[in-house]
Regions:
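Pyridoxal 5′-phosphate
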Residues: 2-411
Length: 411
């Protein structure tokens, strides 16, 4: 969608821009300059006391989306049960259709959830497990998902196969082969991260899915960090299930996620919650969670508008540029350990860095106490360092300050 089409299709609810002080078309024309990103930064109410390089847990909401959220809260509160009974589902369907265009799949295969954890749990707990079935996952997968698999394995008497994803693979084939060699006759499901949350490495999901399907194995993709981060289409991945959190890189309000279920699995999966027992129902039967903040769901539409205004590719390029700004000069420093690949197709914003002789928690503390840089320490098998996660509001000077801090600490 080009900028003219976008401006024409903006929903009224989203035109609460702090950019109202700007002329939007002229503002977008500055997209190739730092002026553009400074105006994006102005759309965020940032704490001036420290540099925030931890956008991986939760993306701060820009003012336009936040203003829209406040309006939606007022609307729902004003209408009360009238909204919940008469309008909630209609608006949810509208948001779902809009979102499906962004993620690249049919709205018939997509539901809104509260986060990736809920999405992946719906699949892991909803499959028809048989004693002896096998699940494959990696040490680098999200910790809570590993625990859920262990719990499910204990409950249904399943086996698990755990592998290690290399931080610096030679090529896609090395990754695909790793998963392929782990498959046995009893393997039913592979859980795989689209982007490894602790290193930022992007895995070749389509190739893994195609390979797994040759063995009759289903693939559940953890895409927590992917929607709104870099461009791809869920349909093109050829996966069976895909979960993501929209309060991360799409910058929707907290408690917004998605679950994609390939249509061929709609009747085979049991929902976590249910309003009825009709297994002939479509994707909607997986979306019932009881009463929850409906205004968060409506605000997803405003988050999409802001994302499209930024430009999907423009945002991805900017995030990768910020990554390169600090990682490339440090790649050959023998005291600094980068746990993220050097191939641009394998990363975007997120990277992980360690310094020899310093624990991840020590490095994180030094960065915050001495340099006022906030990040998160990661101490996991094969990955010991700090996860660095800039955002669209991060400017060049902040990245350079961080880079210089690492060099000073390493020296």
């Amino acid at each position: 969608m080009d900028k003219r089409d976008f401006i024409k299709t903006l929903t009224l609810g989203s035109i609460s821009w702090s950019i109202s002080s700007h002329d939007i078309p002229n503002w977008l024309n500055e997209s190739d300059s730092e002026k553009f990103w400074q105006k994006v930064r102005d759309d965020y109410n940032l704490v001036p006391d420290y540099i925030n390089l931890e956008s991986g847990y939760y993306n701060i909401i820009p003012k336009p989306t936040l203003n829209a959220l406040h309006n939606h809260i007022d609307k729902v509160n004003r209408l009360g049960s009238m909204y919940m009974r008469k309008f909630k589902e209609k608006e949810k369907v509208s948001v779902n259709k809009k979102l499906s265009q962004i993620v690249g799949c049919s709205s018939k295969n997509l539901i809104l959830t509260r986060n990736t954890t809920e999405s992946l749990n719906t699949v892991i707990k909803g499959l028809n497990w048989v004693e002896g079935d096998n699940i494959i996952f990696a040490n680098q997968d999200y910790g809570a998902m590993q625990q859920m698999i262990h719990q499910t394995a204990e409950r249904f008497k399943l086996s698990t196969t755990i592998l290690d994803v290399p931080n610096h693979p030679k090529d896609d084939d090395e990754i695909v082969s790793l998963y392929e060699k782990s498959i046995s006759k009893s393997t039913k499901l592979i859980l795989v991260s689209h982007m490894v949350n602790i290193t930022g490495q992007i895995l070749p999901i389509k190739k893994i899915c195609n390979m797994a399907h040759n063995y009759g194995v289903q693939v559940l993709v953890d895409g927590a960090h992917c929607i709104g981060h870099f461009t791809f289409s869920i349909d093109e991945l050829n996966c069976d299930y895909y979960g993501s959190s929209l309060h991360k890189w799409l910058a929707a309000p907290l408690g917004c996620g998605i679950l994609y279920i390939n249509e061929k699995h709609h009747k085979d999966l049991w929902p976590l919650f249910t309003r009825n027992s009709n297994l002939e129902d479509g994707i909607e039967r997986f979306g019932h969670t009881g009463t929850h903040p409906a205004y968060h769901d409506i605000s997803i539409s405003n988050a999409i508008d802001y994302y499209v205004m930024l430009g999907q590719k423009r945002k991805e390029d900017r995030l990768r540029y910020l990554n390169n700004l600090w990682t490339k000069p440090l790649r050959n420093n023998n005291k600094i350990i980068l746990n993220t690949p050097n191939n641009p197709k394998r990363y975007a914003a997120i990277a992980n860095v360690g310094i020899k002789g310093i624990s991840p928690s020590e490095l994180s503390n030094i960065l915050f106490e001495k340099y006022k840089i906030f990040c998160v320490a990661i101490d996991r098998p094969g990955v010991r360092g700090c996860r660095i996660t800039p955002n669209v509001f991060t400017n060049e000077n902040e990245i350079i300050s961080f880079r210089n801090a690492l060099l000073e600490i390493a020296s």
